[in-house]
């Protein structure tokens, strides 16, 4: 019994170093020395003792050191022929049997704890490195996707608004372009019409100008022709006190003829008064005047007729100068006269000129007939 208790005592401390690696080796070596110094243990073979100590967690060096300290390294177990060593051989085995369940249990618990700790640490590392990023990444991805979806919806709304605005602006621009094109076409039509009207007006104006030029030239010619012929003079009026009283006599027709011949134009009178040759060649007319006035007043009648003719000639010259000035003013104003006025003036001048010429011709012819009749009588 004592040997079994001694065997259990070193087995308990030897189990502790196997379970705890932190405990120093000196106590284990001391317990192993005590275990080897036991008399019963000495009887067991060396290999069994070494195997037992190895089971307790000692290394080969520690086992050798324990054998050296115990002094049993050189001891040999007794021979196999003796019957006494059989029991001690079985005693270490019997001593080891009660110690194995406790140590193995603690060893299993420690190993299980270590394995669980390693598994937990591995799971923690896996969760930290792989699972957590996946979980957090999925959430962040979802948040980012939600943000992107909201931003895309906002962008789509803004794009739709901009598209509608662009469409409205394009429609307004197209309407403006259409209006501008219509205005341009209207302006082009107006320009074409204006060009056509201006061309026609230019042609008409050129024609009117040519007509006016031709009419002005004709007017100038007519005015020049009028200057060549004197204007129609008014019949000279004799005062009533100078008109002699007619006496019934056979020479009345001659007097009538001579009275009709007194209506000769002042041009003829002027020509007769200015040319003494004509006076010398027409003594018959002077005698006719003398017969009109009577034999008693011959000298006074001749004097009065000459003065009257001179006055009439002077008046006609003044009238002619006034008319020439008026004609010059009319020639200056002819360029400003309208077409109708020019035509009317032209027609009136033509009519007046022709009538005056005819009247002058008739009046010039009358005294010749009267003189012929007086010569016949």
From Swiss-Prot:
Record-linked Pfam families: Pex14_N
Positions of post-translational Phosphoserine modification:
232, 282, 335
Annotated region Disordered: the residues are: 1-23, 230-377
Record note on quaternary structure: Interacts with PEX13; forming the PEX13-PEX14 docking complex. Interacts with PEX5 (via WxxxF/Y motifs). Interacts with PEX19. Interacts with tubulin.
Topological domains (Cytoplasmic): residue ranges? 127-377
Main location as per UniProt: membrane
What start and end residues bound the annotated signal peptide? none
* Topology of the protein relative to the lipid bilayer: Single-pass membrane protein
Q: Which Gene3D superfamilies match?
A: Winged helix-like DNA-binding domain superfamily/Winged helix DNA-binding domain
Tell me where in this chain the PTM N-acetylalanine is found: 2
Q: Which organism is it from?
A: Cricetulus longicaudatus (Long-tailed dwarf hamster)
Modified residue N6-acetyllysine is at which positions? 34
Q: What keywords would UniProt list here?
A: Acetylation, Membrane, Peroxisome, Phosphoprotein, Protein transport, Translocation, Transmembrane, Transmembrane helix, Transport
Localization (cell) = Peroxisome membrane
Identification of the protein by name = Peroxisomal membrane protein PEX14
GO CC annotation, single? peroxisomal importomer complex
> What's the name of its gene?
PEX14
Q: Where are the transmembrane segments?
A: 109-126
GO biological-process terms attached to the record: negative regulation of DNA-binding transcription factor activity; negative regulation of DNA-templated transcription; protein import into peroxisome matrix; protein import into peroxisome matrix, docking
Q: Which residues form a coiled coil?
A: none
Which of the residues are on side Peroxisomal?
Answer: 2-108
Which residues lie in Basic and acidic residues bias regions? 360-377
Q: What does this protein do?
A: Component of the PEX13-PEX14 docking complex, a translocon channel that specifically mediates the import of peroxisomal cargo proteins bound to PEX5 receptor. The PEX13-PEX14 docking complex forms a large import pore which can be opened to a diameter of about 9 nm. Mechanistically, PEX5 receptor along with cargo proteins associates with the PEX14 subunit of the PEX13-PEX14 docking complex in the cytosol, leading to the insertion of the receptor into the organelle membrane with the concomitant translocation of the cargo into the peroxisome matrix.
- Give the Gene Ontology MF terms in alphabetical order: identical protein binding; protein transmembrane transporter activity; protein-macromolecule adaptor activity; signaling receptor binding; transcription corepressor activity
Where along the chain is composition biased (Low complexity)? 1-20, 244-259, 265-275
């Amino acid at each position: 019994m004592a040997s079994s208790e001694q065997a259990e005592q070193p087995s308990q401390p030897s189990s502790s170093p196997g379970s705890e690696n932190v405990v120093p080796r000196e106590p284990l070596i001391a317990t192993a020395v005590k275990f080897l110094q036991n008399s019963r243990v000495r009887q067991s073979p060396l290999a069994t003792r070494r195997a037992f100590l190895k089971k307790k967690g000692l290394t080969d060096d520690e086992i050798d050191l324990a054998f050296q300290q115990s002094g049993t390294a050189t001891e040999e177990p007794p021979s196999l022929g003796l019957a006494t060593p059989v029991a001690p051989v079985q005693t270490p085995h019997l001593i080891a049997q009660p110690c194995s369940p406790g140590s193995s249990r603690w060893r299993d618990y420690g190993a299980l704890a270590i394995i669980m700790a390693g598994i937990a640490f591995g799971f923690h590392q896996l969760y930290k490195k792989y699972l957590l990023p996946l979980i957090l990444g999925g959430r962040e991805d979802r948040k980012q996707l939600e943000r992107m979806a909201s931003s895309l919806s906002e962008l789509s709304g803004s794009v739709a608004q901009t598209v509608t605005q662009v469409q409205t602006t394009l429609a307004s621009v197209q309407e403006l372009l259409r209006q501008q094109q219509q205005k341009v076409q209207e302006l082009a039509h107006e320009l074409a019409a204006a060009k056509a009207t201006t061309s026609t007006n230019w042609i008409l104006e050129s024609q009117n100008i040519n007509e006016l030029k031709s009419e002005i030239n004709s007017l100038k010619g007519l005015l020049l022709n009028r200057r060549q012929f004197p204007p129609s003079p008014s019949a000279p009026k004799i005062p009533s006190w100078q008109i002699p009283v007619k006496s019934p006599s056979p020479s009345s027709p001659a007097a009538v003829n001579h009275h009709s011949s007194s209506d000769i134009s002042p041009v003829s009178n002027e020509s007769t008064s200015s040319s003494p040759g004509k006076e010398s060649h027409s003594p018959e007319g002077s005698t006719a005047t003398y017969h009109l006035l009577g034999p008693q007043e011959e000298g006074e009648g001749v004097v009065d007729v000459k003065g009257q003719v001179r006055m009439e000639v002077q008046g006609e010259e003044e009238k002619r100068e006034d008319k020439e000035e008026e004609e010059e003013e009319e020639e200056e104003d002819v360029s400003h006269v309208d077409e109708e006025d020019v035509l009317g003036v032209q027609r009136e001048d033509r009519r007046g000129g022709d009538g005056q010429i005819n009247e002058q011709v008739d009046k010039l012819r009358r005294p010749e007939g009267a003189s012929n009749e007086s010569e016949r009588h």
